[in-house]
Amino acid sequence: MRRWPVDHRRRGRRRLSSWIWFLLGSFSVAGLVLFIVQHYHHQQDPSQLLLERDTRTEMVSPPHLNFTEEVTSASSFSRQLAEQMTLAKAYVFIAKEHNNLHLAWELSSKIRSCQLLLSKAAMRGQPISFDEAKPIITGLSALIYKAQDAHYDIATTMMTMKSHIQALEERANAATVQTTIFGQLVAEALPKSLHCLTIKLTSDWVTEPSRHELADENRNSPRLVDNNLYHFCIFSDNVIATSVVVNSTVSNADHPKQLVFHIVTNRVSYKAMQAWFLSNDFKGSAIEIRSVEEFSWLNASYSPVVKQLLDTDARAYYFGEQTSQDTISEPKVRNPKYLSLLNHLRFYIPEIYPQLEKIVFLDDDVVVQKDLTPLFSLDLHGNVNGAVETCLEAFHRYYKYLNFSNPLISSKFDPQACGWAFGMNVFDLIAWRNANVTARYHYWQDQNRERTLWKLGTLPPGLLSFYGLTEPLDRRWHVLGLGYDVNIDNRLIETAAVIHYNGNMKPWLKLAIGRYKPFWLKFLNSSHPYLQDCVTA
């Protein structure tokens, strides 16, 4: 039998060759399958691609979510809907401009559906699901594509958006001016409850003559001119506001019987003011009530400001038709307090109280939280006015209050000088008389007859009159802004000796900032029967 020749090749090598061919075939099949899958993936509707989201996010979402965060989240349907809705709104305006009303109507309809879905999601506190978002996003995508296909290009969109933004800015500016005017009107108005209280107190004064004798005794008290006591002055026609100032001051004083309050009001409020302070206890402090009409020496022949207040042109400027640019841009120019002599009495303190040497001036919209008697021992270094400076903000520099384009101002004052605040000031009346500050005040009022140096208020002439005569105090003595600034640090308020509700949002008004109102209410005698009757009336 013939024998086959021996094959010296290894069997292992033949097996290796078979495996190589098997692996090559497997990779070829896998590549073909991957190609088919990728091809199918790219064939999908673009709107479906926009809707892809990780469903696991929905499964772990809490039942009540922060909808603001949901709208701003890059992975939420809410944000996608909001972005498409914004773009659709732009195309609504463009479609209307091109008289394509049908497309504008379709877009508006989808926008309303989108807004409804977003509001429902916000109300229920749960994210929008895929099934809810899909029909709206698909419809909006189709309409946006239709708008783009109508050749509403980017340039057209930008021009339309620009004009729309300008129109919105004009409306916003008009609304801001209107809000300022309305806020000013509310701030100027006397609340019904305060008017009611004034009437009741005036009636008491008229029907009870015994109070007149007590008032005369108070006015002749030797404590009123005793320089060993602590003297405070308040000029106001607001009974409740003045009461809170006095009550908060005596409540925080270590020795309230050593305090003397000098209150000046007008003829209208004089009787009510007397009746209130005679019928309430202020811990033994001395209180003097006077009327500004008593100061016969304060007349037009002596005081330029009195002459201006009586001037018909000045009254027309404040109360006439709003035809000037000043009254349009500055609605507070028309505030009647700028025509009230009470507002200007602070410049005549040494003449009103000729026997006093030092006094603390308090506005009627402040609340005292600490003992103020240490103010009287402060060293003012020969200055007249101790006040808290307000130049931490740039807009409280001199150039913001005064017209530095006028050489009379620019040649004498530093535009970057720090402003300061009225509201809580300690005055050295001896230094005042020596520097003749009131004469300075008269000079600047004369120079401002045409209102070319400043427009309104008592602070600008105060900055001029006390220039170089003001001693800066620690800011904790006087914290301002509670009548307009909602973001004052609580720690600053709590450590303040005096908090000041300067601004339109006074604490006795309904538009007061609620966060700050309790500080004022704490010192209001709300248990008084007249207050209870008038609040519920």
UniProtKB/Swiss-Prot annotation:
Q: Which residues lie on this side of the membrane: Lumenal?
A: 38-537
What keywords would UniProt list here?
Answer: Cell wall biogenesis/degradation, Glycoprotein, Glycosyltransferase, Golgi apparatus, Membrane, Signal-anchor, Transferase, Transmembrane, Transmembrane helix
Q: What is its EC number?
A: 2.4.1.43
What this protein catalyses is:
[(1->4)-alpha-D-galacturonosyl](n) + UDP-alpha-D-galacturonate = [(1->4)-alpha-D-galacturonosyl](n+1) + UDP + H(+)
Q: How does it sit in the membrane?
A: Single-pass type II membrane protein
User: What is the annotated tissue distribution of the protein whose record heads this document?
Assistant: Expressed in roots, inflorescences, siliques, seeds, leaves and stems.
**Protein name per its UniProtKB record:** Hexosyltransferase GAUT11
Q: What is the source species?
A: Arabidopsis thaliana
